[in-house]
């Protein structure tokens, strides 16, 4: 078998990626989230495939087909709740993975980082379209509000929105195409994840110290396969606790009402994992300005390699930058809370301050802190 895995064309690829891969000896549990995201993607594709066998993308029957899955299909309730909560789990792992990349300076690997940002956009698009499919109240109104944002684009906006809708409102054509895109995008995400991994293995992994680790590498198997397996066990324990005991904890009760174009819910909001970006969108009174801020809230990550001023890569020995990083994390939590609140005082001003702080920390405070720390270390 040793000879086989090193010589067979297919086995050789797996061997170089997961078995004989030289890995830094000191990477911590924060490096587990890449493999956990792979597991989340497998769970989502598998559960989604079984749901697609019973789901009908039609405005008249979509809601009842989801009800049918939960009531009549063998273990349909389990598959449905695994898929819905799997999305939440996916985003928890995704945000932790990005946070680790920011903390330890992994954004220095620019190709890997930029493909990661593309993966984030693709995952957000997939999750948004998936939320529309059950055709509940929040599905319908969420789709209407979010797609309508594109009308803020000058000149082509209105035509673009109607083109995406396939008519003059969110209707059967919209649902049909959203289902088609929701089905194909995870496979594109899987392909992009392989490219992400390819570029990562060109440079090798970063480590908590942020220093070159060429002099001290260990084989990926058995050390990190065992470590990843522990992460997988803990993740699945958390996941099935959520699915079996609290399946509706992260959902919206409004989505248990069938979509009604004549009745607007009192408060339209997306799923919890988009609330921070939604709060940034709402904090700007101008429609186009809000859309630009929404896109920039994610795209600002692409600027990180270009605005790095510190001579040290990791934040491990940089106390000022550490403080700012955790301030940013707290700010994202505040934005997530604000995104779920109605648009009224004092939430409006809190949202505006938190949005301003979000961009200021990343674009101004972090680079300035890097320069100060260089001076402190006499670099």
Curated annotation (Swiss-Prot):
Locations listed in the record: Mitochondrion inner membrane
Bilayer-crossing regions: 33-53, 77-98, 113-133, 178-198, 226-246, 288-308, 320-340, 347-367
A cellular component annotation (GO) from this entry: mitochondrial inner membrane
SUPFAM superfamilies: a domain/subunit of cytochrome bc1 complex (Ubiquinol-cytochrome c reductase), Transmembrane di-heme cytochromes
Residues at which heme b b562 binds: 83, 182
Membrane topology: Multi-pass membrane protein
Keyword Transport included in the entry's annotation: yes
Cofactor field: heme b
Residues annotated as binding heme b b566: 97, 196
Signal peptide: none
Disulfide bond positions: none
GO function terms (MF aspect): metal ion binding; ubiquinol-cytochrome-c reductase activity
Top-level taxonomic group: Eukaryota
Gene Ontology biological-process annotations: mitochondrial electron transport, ubiquinol to cytochrome c
Binding site for a ubiquinone: 201
Cofactor: how bound: Binds 2 heme b groups non-covalently.
Keywords: Electron transport, Heme, Iron, Membrane, Metal-binding, Mitochondrion, Mitochondrion inner membrane, Respiratory chain, Transmembrane, Transmembrane helix, Transport, Ubiquinone
Function: Component of the ubiquinol-cytochrome c reductase complex (complex III or cytochrome b-c1 complex) that is part of the mitochondrial respiratory chain. The b-c1 complex mediates electron transfer from ubiquinol to cytochrome c. Contributes to the generation of a proton gradient across the mitochondrial membrane that is then used for ATP synthesis.
Family stated for the protein in its record: Belongs to the cytochrome b family.
Subunit structure: The cytochrome bc1 complex contains 11 subunits: 3 respiratory subunits (MT-CYB, CYC1 and UQCRFS1), 2 core proteins (UQCRC1 and UQCRC2) and 6 low-molecular weight proteins (UQCRH/QCR6, UQCRB/QCR7, UQCRQ/QCR8, UQCR10/QCR9, UQCR11/QCR10 and a cleavage product of UQCRFS1). This cytochrome bc1 complex then forms a dimer.
Note: Heme 1 (or BL or b562) is low-potential and absorbs at about 562 nm, and heme 2 (or BH or b566) is high-potential and absorbs at about 566 nm.
Name used for this protein in its record: Cytochrome b
């Amino acid at each position: 078998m040793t000879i086989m895995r090193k010589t067979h064309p297919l086995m050789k690829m797996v061997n170089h990626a997961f078995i004989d891969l030289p890995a830094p000896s000191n990477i911590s549990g924060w490096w587990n989230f890449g493999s956990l995201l792979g597991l989340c993607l497998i769970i989502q594709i598998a559960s989604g495939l079984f749901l697609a066998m019973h789901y009908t993308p039609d405005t008249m029957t979509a809601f009842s087909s989801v009800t049918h899955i939960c009531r009549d299909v063998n273990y349909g309730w389990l598959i449905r709740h695994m898929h819905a909560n799997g999305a939440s789990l996916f985003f928890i792992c995704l945000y932790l993975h990005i946070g680790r990349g920011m903390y330890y300076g992994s954004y220095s690997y620019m190709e890997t980082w930029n493909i990661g940002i593309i993966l984030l956009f693709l995952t957000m698009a997939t999750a948004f379209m998936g939320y529309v499919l059950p055709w509940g109240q929040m599905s319908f109104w969420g789709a209407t509000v979010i797609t309508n944002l594109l009308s803020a684009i000058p000149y082509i906006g209105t035509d673009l929105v109607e083109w995406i809708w396939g008519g003059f409102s969110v209707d059967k054509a919209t649902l049909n195409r959203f289902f088609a895109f929701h089905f194909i995008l995870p496979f594109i995400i899987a392909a992009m994840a392989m490219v992400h991994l390819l570029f990562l293995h060109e440079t090798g992994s970063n480590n908590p110290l942020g220093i070159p680790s060429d002099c001290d590498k260990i084989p990926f198997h058995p050390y990190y396969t065992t470590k990843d397996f522990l992460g997988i066990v803990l993740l699945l324990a958390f996941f099935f606790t959520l699915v079996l005991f609290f399946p509706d904890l992260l959902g919206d009760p409004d989505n248990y009402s069938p979509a009604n174009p004549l009745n607007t819910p009192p408060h339209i909001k997306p799923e919890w994992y988009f609330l921070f970006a939604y709060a940034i969108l709402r904090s700007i009174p101008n429609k186009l300005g809000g859309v630009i801020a929404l896109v920039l809230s994610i795209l600002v990550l692409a600027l990180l390699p270009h605005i790095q001023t510190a001579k040290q890569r990791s934040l491990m020995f940089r106390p000022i930058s550490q403080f700012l990083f955790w301030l940013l994390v707290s700010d994202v939590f505040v934005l997530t809370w604000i995104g779920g609140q109605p648009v009224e005082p004092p939430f409006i001003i809190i949202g505006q301050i938190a949005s301003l702080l979000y961009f200021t920390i990343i674009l101004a405070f972090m680079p300035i802190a890097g320069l100060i720390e260089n001076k402190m270390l006499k670099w």
